[in-house]
């Protein structure tokens, strides 16, 4: 499958230039990319296939890194990684010296936290909410 649209997405702002038909095509390209790459490197496939449209939609309306995205479980972030400039590094997903299978702020300013499993998501979201609604913000 030729990835014409995915090859042109290097940052979330690129998504805002797409029309609805292109977004639908992009989501299909992302699924194909994930299937192809995860079959080589291993990783969390189902959770990522289930969040493609959601992640694309979030990046079309939010402005990361200013806005923070908290994933239910960190290993749902593969589409997020593709949309934030790490597509070319996917050959080394979860490999030595490769990109992490979880959000990691050392990889990208678009990753707010290092988070893996579900119990951290609620705590992170509450913390962000408290920060932005407190007098300290």
What label would you give each PLM region?
Residues 1-37:
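Cofactor-/ligand-binding subdomain signature composed of acidic, glycine-rich
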Residues 2, 44-134:
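Cofactor-binding active-site loop characterized by glycine-rich and histidine/acidic residues
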Residues 11-15, 35-43, 107-114:
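Glycine- and acidic
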């Amino acid at each position: 499958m030729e990835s014409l649209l995915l090859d042109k997405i290097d940052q979330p702002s690129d998504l805002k230039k797409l029309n609805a038909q292109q977004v639908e095509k992009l989501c299909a390209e992302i699924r194909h990319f994930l299937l192809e790459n995860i079959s080589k490197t291993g990783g969390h496939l189902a959770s990522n296939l289930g969040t493609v449209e959601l992640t694309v939609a979030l990046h079309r309306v939010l402005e990361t890194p200013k806005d923070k995205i908290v994933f239910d479980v960190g290993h749902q972030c593969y589409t997020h990684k593709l949309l934030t400039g790490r597509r070319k590094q996917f050959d080394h997903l979860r490999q030595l010296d490769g990109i992490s299978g979880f959000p990691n702020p050392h990889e990208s300013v678009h990753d707010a936290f290092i988070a893996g499993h579900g119990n951290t998501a609620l705590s992170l979201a509450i913390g962000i909410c408290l920060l932005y609604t407190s007098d300290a913000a």
